[in-house]
Structure formats: structure tokens, C-alpha cells
Amino acid sequence: MGAEYDFAATPGFEEGGSEYYSVAGAERMRDVLPGFDSGTTLIGILGQPFKCPPAPFEGALLLHDHLVERGIRADAEIRVIGPMAAPVPITKEVSQSILDALHERGVEYVPKQRVVELDPHSKEARLESGGTVSYDLFVGIPVHRVPAVVESSGLAVDGWVPVDHTNLTTRFPDVYALGDVAGVPIAKAGVFAEAAAAVVADDIGARLRGGVLQRPYEGAGSCYIEFGRGMVGKVEANFLGGPAPTARLVGPSRELAAEKEAFASTRRARWFGS
């Protein structure tokens, strides 16, 4: 079932903010952007964890390109604000590459700050620390939560479903939790859910044969990062396969942009038959 968005968790967000995490939100933002001609766009990460950790920064880089194409970049300020100390906390290398790309384009990153409320009338964002930040266009990464049916089932503890990291079993017999609902310390992204599904299938098969899972879940996978200007990078991460999470960045390059397109096409065909 994945994670759902709790827009109401941030007062004022539904009335005074935009978002591109949902299809409906992306369509509304498409209609809002042409009306933004100058001022400050504030991209706020409203809670953790959230899907696709690079996405807020991808949004900033792509917005930069959009404003350049319209010839109004000099009239606009782009700021990203979030509770993390770095864009991708598990890896200094990837974080620094993102920070360098933001700096090169004049995008400000404000770490260790979280927006907790918007005032749509004064266009001010209130921070958890007590301060405020003014904006002309607010784009939020909404608070995530498990679906209501998972919450009411009793599976969730402290917001997510606790599991055995090796095979993704829950504390209930014969019940697994995989993907975004699972309380494992990995990024919430489809590639990790796909890998988790394979482990769960292997574990069920092994149990039916009277054996044990031969290869535990490692939380390993690759995800792509849009750097703008037609360039794409790829992060290869392993969250659970060693003593500490690891990640490295390949690219960015135009070749990886083509690879990303091929990856998406393959998954659409596999999952949706198109």
C-alpha cells in the first residue's frame, strides 16, 4: 500500500502550498508555475522519512532550469529547507555533489530546520525552531504516514510497521511488510520495494520447502537523480548489507539520462504491461 501523504499535518499547507508528490498536486503545480514571475520559492521538507530523498533537490534544480528558460531566473530566489543536516545524510559524497549543484545555480539550502505551519495570507512559513521564513511560492514535501487501514490493523508502531530486517517478517505470524510501510532504515523508493518483494518471495518459498532464506535483505539498489540541463546521476546504495550504510554517485551524464528512460520503460512494461 505504500506511504500516504498527510497534508493536514502541516496547518496552512493545503490552503497555501503546492506539491508535486501526488499526480493531482503535480498537475496543480503545472498550472501554478506560469503565474510565478518573481520572488522566493521555498521548497520545504515537512517531515521524515519521505519518498525519494533526492526529490526535493531535483525539484529545485529543475525549477532553476524552468525559470532560466523563461528568462526570469534573475528575478527569483530558490531556497530548500529541511530537517536533515545534509541532502543525503548517509553519504557525504552524494550530499556534496548535490550541494555543489545547488550552489552553482544559486539555490540556497537551509539544513536542520523544519516548516511546521504556513500562513497563506502573510505568506510566512513558521519553523519548528520558532523563526519564520517569507515566501512567494511554497512547495512542500508532505508529511508521510502509513495508510489508515494499516494504522487501524495494529501493525504499525511509532508510525511504521516494524519488521525483521533480514526477511521483512512482522511480529505477527506469516505477515510480511515491505516497501514504504516497513520500518526499516532505508530510503523509501520503488527500487527498494522491488528488491524487498523478491526477498519475501524467496523466504516464503524456502519456508514451504522446509528450508531457510539463503540471502537476507540488504536494502540495496540504485536510484536516479535529475541534475537538470539534461543530466542525470545514479546513486548506488546499500543500507543493510554491511556495518554501515554506503552510497556512491555515478555521473551525472547524458548517458545516464538515457539509462533512466530505459529503466522506466522496462518497469512500466513489467508492472503495467505498457
Where are these regions (language model features)?
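Rossmann-like NAD(P)H-binding beta-loop-alpha module
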Residues: A24-A76
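Extended hydrophobic secondary-structure segments that form protein cores and membrane-embedded regions
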Residues: I43-G44, E77-M84, G219-F227
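FAD-site-proximal beta/loop scaffold in flavoenzymes
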Residues: E4-D37, T132-A198, D202-A206
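C-terminal auxiliary extensions adjacent to catalytic cores
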Residues: K234-S274
